[in-house]
Amino acid sequence: MEPSATPGAQPGVPTSSGEPFHLPPDYEDEFLRYLWRDYLYPKQYEWVLIAAYVAVFLIALVGNTLVCLAVWRNHHMRTVTNYFIVNLSLADVLVTAICLPASLLVDITESWLFGHALCKVIPYLQAVSVSVAVLTLSFIALDRWYAICHPLLFKSTARRARGSILGIWAVSLAVMVPQAAVMECSSVLPELANRTRLFSVCDERWADELYPKIYHSCFFFVTYLAPLGLMGMAYFQIFRKLWGPQIPGTTSALVRNWKRPSEQLEAQHQGLCTEPQPRARAFLAEVKQMRARRKTAKMLMVVLLVFALCYLPISVLNVLKRVFGMFRQASDREAVYACFTFSHWLVYANSAANPIIYNFLSGKFREQFKAAFSCCLPGLGPSSSARHKSLSLQSRCSVSKVSEHVVLTTVTTVLS
């Protein structure tokens, strides 16, 4: 996404592409007030956009910060997948804190108000965050694919994950340098350039018209089309491995056919029921691992799907604009403006959506989020949830003992 790029100047306002525009000195101040009142002051629907941006800003910053704190404060959550999730959250915090305010002001005022230096820095950081997000999601998919589909080919470790994260940032910072190099700030009303930054534009300047077509075609393929295609194939194989049919009689097949292992595992952990036999315990461990892998895979698939949907509109619009030259003389300019504005917002909404996904699809993250808010809402603390779970387990203990005896006897017979 390009936070500085706008579809064009406001309708009815003279631009540098038209006739020379001159104002008598006495009328400059009056003209600026006129521009602010009729063109720059937010319209009613733009106030809705501002509220949506503010909501995304707060949710993204708070949510992604809590994700980082949850992994940092809990050693049992420092898994390879969670390291990559933290890296994704850091990229979301970066783009939200630095790029979102600029995008909001550009979308509302259609003016670049931050000067020449930030005209290069902010779009560059935006491109870097996109690259980091795509590469991080790709490494997550690759790690899950190896762990589930080919566990003997590659052993993932936390040290390798940290090295991969450093490599992701190094590659992203390097390959996005051209984005900063081509960004320039200019005014569509040069006569007022020394009086105001209104109607200044931060946009790309290329030496030849062919270069942006090549660059943005490659950008779309490398940061969207190709990685999403590869990740889709990886998760398809993961889905088949975790939910597909298995050879009858194998342990994995038994895991799929046994529908209620959670009560027994929780009861054993709390010491409420008798301890099962060693081989049965191994089976229960595999049940737990299978269920955990399913939950993790489901969460990561949702994260990838939301990312693809949120980045699709701006990716397509940028290709249409930069590669095919559309929207330069758009007849219905308000519709084009609305499309670009909504697509910009969707990119930041993705940053806010990720912590929400973790909350609903990951029990560990949900407990940590509840613990973080427990100072304000004591009923949300993990201790309350644990007490409720303990009472529930005690009420089921007698039933669990009987079902455990029957199931474990059957499992032991089959596995012998």
Curated annotation (Swiss-Prot):
Signals that turn on the gene: By nutritional state, up-regulated by fasting.
Pfam families documented for this protein: 7tm_1 (PF00001)
Tissue expression: Highly expressed in the brain in the prefrontal cortex, hippocampus, paraventricular thalamus, ventromedial hypothalamus, arcuate nucleus, dorsal raphe nucleus, and locus coeruleus. Not detected in the spleen, lung, liver, skeletal muscle, kidney and testis. Orexin receptor mRNA expression has also been reported in the adrenal gland, enteric nervous system, and pancreas.
Gene Ontology terms describing biological process: cellular response to hormone stimulus; feeding behavior; G protein-coupled receptor signaling pathway; neuropeptide signaling pathway; positive regulation of ERK1 and ERK2 cascade; regulation of cytosolic calcium ion concentration
Ranges of the Cytoplasmic topological domain: 68-82, 141-160, 236-298, 361-416
Main localization (coarse): membrane
Subcellular location: Cell membrane
Keywords carried by this UniProt record: Cell membrane, Disulfide bond, G-protein coupled receptor, Glycoprotein, Membrane, Receptor, Transducer, Transmembrane, Transmembrane helix
GO function terms (MF aspect): G protein-coupled receptor activity; orexin receptor activity; peptide hormone binding
InterPro entries: GPCR_Rhodpsn, GPCR_Rhodpsn_7TM, Orexin_rcpt, OX1R
Signal peptide: none
One GO cellular component, as annotated: plasma membrane
Region (Required for response to orexin-A): 26-41
Bridged cysteine pairs (disulfide): 119-202
Membrane-side (Extracellular) residue stretches: 1-46, 106-119, 183-213, 322-336
Gene3D superfamilies to which the protein is assigned, alphabetical: Rhodopsin 7-helix transmembrane proteins
Region (Disordered): 1-22
UniProt domain comment: The N-terminal region is required for orexin signaling.
Family: Belongs to the G-protein coupled receptor 1 family.
Role according to the record: Moderately selective excitatory receptor for orexin-A and, with a lower affinity, for orexin-B neuropeptide. Triggers an increase in cytoplasmic Ca(2+) levels in response to orexin-A binding.
Name of the protein described by the UniProt record: Orexin/Hypocretin receptor type 1
